[in-house]
């Protein structure tokens, strides 16, 4: 059974799906309320709206799925499979960096206590996370000194001939040598350490006071002094710091700043009502979380020729982003604060809060504060994110000139390139052919100047003619309106597309314009007039990376526009896929509700005004299955606290 046939036979309940490549390797894991509807959307988007998803579908040759009982189970299973398989297309944390925990190996004959960043289901007790990170090491050192648990790496599953120095300086009970301590005494020390780590200070104090009095009564004054010193240390520690626990004053607060395709996020860790730490995250380019709104410019009939451009407005979707981010940070973690405050709402916020509550066995407040102190905290996190953005991304600018100078040399330009316009063509076997133009200016993508075109004069598959039409329309208008030509025109394609573009410019009298192209597979740059001398740059060349980035952005915009036009063409026919809906019923539904969107939003009662109840229920069920979470709910970004992605 091929991939498309397998997708058509998927069940309609909730579950998790796994895409595999030709080697049988899992390359992507996702979840869905309705498996068939969600996975089928990949077929409907044969030309995906971003380069990453397009790459996924080009590699995917097989599909597995697992059905579950509800959305909570799907969330948990998806996260678990991502962590186990680490699929290339949706691993979020590049290094799985976490704050440290204190581990107490309760399953061992003689338990040890030490710091770890790796959490396992091994019967041990984990405490934390601790903020800042060095607090965990200070806590463990205090436990070693106070409760005399071993700090060495000696194997305690068997006895040894002699004890180490730690025993003789009274820093260890010596469980490595038989008869130096008793199992009862060691268990008592472990219990003390456990109470201490669990924040049961009052219980520990009472126990120490009783033992101190008993030792004094038995005239064991050295032992009594030890308990006294331990009580003093415990009092001092409780005054200065608090072991991490899940009380009502614990909260994580998020803020973000997005600008020019780059994102900074700040995370405040509030413990006991006080901010104990701050984390920063950075991303550069997040196509998975961009939404576009495009409206064709109004033109008079007499102006139609040379027009038809589409101004594209890209909007960052913070809700979808935070949905993915929070799942990566909190699902299957032993500690989750009772309150998590985010700056924006997202579709599955309540479902995620419910899953985390089941995971932690206490209520989780996952909220978007609107006023008061909580809102002030979110605003403060946002202000800090803006400062982080300034410090991180502004320092990148000095390097930009060096890259521009290198590009100037590579393309033999007389002046430093400040504006590049890049074009790409998209179609499926000649159907709904469209083109995109993206703009790079002074070190950043200038999204306000992006344009998209519907090909009007070319029928069938002819990329060269399509490219010629687009450049003719674009630069005829530039010339008529006396706008400046770009420093470089970049074409996504090979020599054929390059020459077609140059021919269009020459017809407009632009014979000195610099035109270059980049071939997809070879990643070779061709310069018009020097096609026999291709520019081959090193794979790590910043100039090649810049050209690739611009080319990939243009490709993404072209296929996004192509998908939108195809969806507009096919949207009315979607109703015909629903049992009980024929052409007449479809017409009545569209007339009554005004559009497919109106039908999609209607509930069963509203639909019964037009169709019988069984048909209304079928329509509602069909569209309910398509109200799946945003693509990012499966987690489609990488997190790196030290590098720009």
Swiss-Prot record:
The record lists the membrane-crossing segments as none
Among SUPFAM superfamilies, the record links this protein to:
C-terminal UvrC-binding domain of UvrB, GIY-YIG endonuclease, RuvA domain 2-like
Q: Which residues form a coiled coil?
A: none
What this chain does, per the entry, is described as: The UvrABC repair system catalyzes the recognition and processing of DNA lesions. UvrC both incises the 5' and 3' sides of the lesion. The N-terminal half is responsible for the 3' incision and the C-terminal half is responsible for the 5' incision.
Q: Does the keyword Cytoplasm apply?
A: yes
Tell me the Gene Ontology biological-process terms attached to this UniProt entry: nucleotide-excision repair; SOS response
Report the locations given in the UniProt record. Cytoplasm
Subunit-structure text: Interacts with UvrB in an incision complex.
**Record's SMART domains?**
GIYc
Record's keyword annotation contains Oxidoreductase: no
In the UniProt record, which is one GO cellular component term? excinuclease repair complex
Annotated UVR domain ranges read 202-237
Task: Identify its protein family.
Answer: Belongs to the UvrC family.
Question: GO molecular function, one example?
Answer: excinuclease ABC activity
Q: Where is the GIY-YIG domain?
A: 12-91
The entry's keywords:
Cytoplasm, DNA damage, DNA excision, DNA repair, Excision nuclease, SOS response
User: What organism does the UniProt record list as the source?
Assistant: Acidobacterium capsulatum (strain ATCC 51196 / DSM 11244 / BCRC 80197 / JCM 7670 / NBRC 15755 / NCIMB 13165 / 161)
Q: What is the protein's name according to its record? A: UvrABC system protein C
């Amino acid at each position: 059974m091929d991939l498309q046939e397998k997708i058509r036979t998927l069940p309609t309940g909730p579950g998790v799906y796994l895409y595999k490549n030709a080697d049988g390797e899992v390359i992507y894991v996702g979840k869905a309320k309705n498996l068939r509807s969600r996975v089928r959307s990949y077929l409907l988007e044969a030309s995906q709206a971003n380069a990453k998803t397009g790459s996924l579908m080009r590699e995917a040759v097989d599909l597995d799925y697992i059905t579950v009982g509800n959305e909570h189970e799907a969330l948990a299973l998806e996260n678990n499979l991502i962590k186990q398989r680490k699929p290339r297309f949706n691993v979020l944390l590049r290094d799985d960096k976490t704050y440290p925990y204190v581990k107490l190996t309760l399953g061992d004959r003689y338990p040890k206590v030490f710091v770890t960043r790796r959490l396992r289901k091994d019967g041990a007790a984990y405490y934390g996370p601790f903020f800042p990170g060095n607090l965990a090491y200070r806590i463990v050192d205090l436990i070693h000194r106070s409760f005399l648990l071993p700090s060495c790496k000696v194997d305690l599953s068997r006895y040894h001939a002699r004890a180490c120095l730690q025993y003789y300086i009274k820093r260890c009970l010596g469980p490595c040598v038989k008869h130096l301590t008793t199992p009862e005494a060691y268990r008592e020390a472990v219990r003390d350490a456990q109470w201490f780590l669990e924040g049961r200070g009052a219980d520990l104090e009472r126990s120490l006071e009783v033992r101190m009095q008993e030792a004094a009564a038995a005239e064991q004054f050295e032992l009594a002094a030890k308990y006294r010193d331990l009580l003093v240390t415990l009092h001092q520690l409780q005054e200065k710091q608090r072991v991490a626990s899940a009380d009502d004053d614990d909260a994580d607060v998020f803020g973000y700043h997005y600008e020019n395709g780059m994102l900074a996020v700040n995370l405040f860790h509030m413990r006991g009502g006080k901010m104990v730490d701050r984390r920063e995250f950075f991303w550069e380019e997040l196509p998975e979380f961009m939404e576009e709104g495009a409206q064709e410019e109004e033109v008079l009939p007499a102006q139609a020729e040379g027009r038809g451009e589409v101004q594209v407005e890209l909007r960052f979707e913070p809700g979808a982003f935070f949905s993915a981010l929070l799942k990566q940070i909190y699902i299957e973690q032993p500690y989750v604060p009772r309150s998590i405050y985010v700056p924006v709402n997202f579709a599955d916020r309540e479902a995620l809060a419910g899953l985390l509550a089941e995971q932690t066995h206490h209520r989780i407040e996952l909220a978007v504060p609107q006023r008061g102190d909580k809102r002030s905290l979110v605003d403060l996190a946002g202000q800090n994110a803006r400062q982080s953005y300034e410090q991180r991304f502004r320092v990148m600018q000095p390097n930009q000139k060096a890259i521009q100078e290198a590009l100037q040399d590579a393309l033999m330009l007389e002046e430093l390139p400040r504006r590049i316009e890049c074009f790409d063509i998209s179609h499926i076997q000649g159907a709904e052919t469209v083109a995109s133009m993206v703009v790079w200016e002074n070190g950043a993508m200038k999204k306000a100047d992006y344009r998209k075109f519907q090909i009007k004069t070319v029928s069938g598959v002819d990329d060269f003619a399509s490219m010629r039409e687009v450049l003719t329309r674009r630069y005829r208008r530039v010339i008529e309106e006396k706008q400046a030509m770009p420093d470089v025109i970049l074409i996504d394609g090979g020599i054929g597309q390059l020459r077609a573009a140059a021919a269009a410019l020459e017809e407009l009298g632009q014979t000195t314009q610099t035109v270059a192209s980049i071939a997809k597979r070879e990643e070779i740059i061709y310069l018009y007039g020097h096609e026999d001398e291709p520019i081959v740059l090193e794979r790590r060349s910043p100039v090649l990376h810049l050209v690739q980035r611009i080319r990939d952005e243009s490709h993404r915009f072209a296929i996004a526009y192509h998908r939108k036009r195809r969806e507009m063409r096919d949207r009315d026919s979607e109703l015909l896929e629903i049992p009980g809906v024929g052409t007449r019923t479809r017409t009545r539904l569209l007339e009554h509700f005004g559009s497919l969107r109106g039908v999609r939003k209607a509930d069963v009662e509203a639909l019964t005004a037009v169709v019988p109840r069984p048909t209304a229920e079928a329509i509602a069920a069909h569209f309910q299955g398509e109200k799946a979470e945003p693509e990012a709910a499966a987690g489609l970004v990488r997190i790196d606290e030290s590098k720009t992605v």
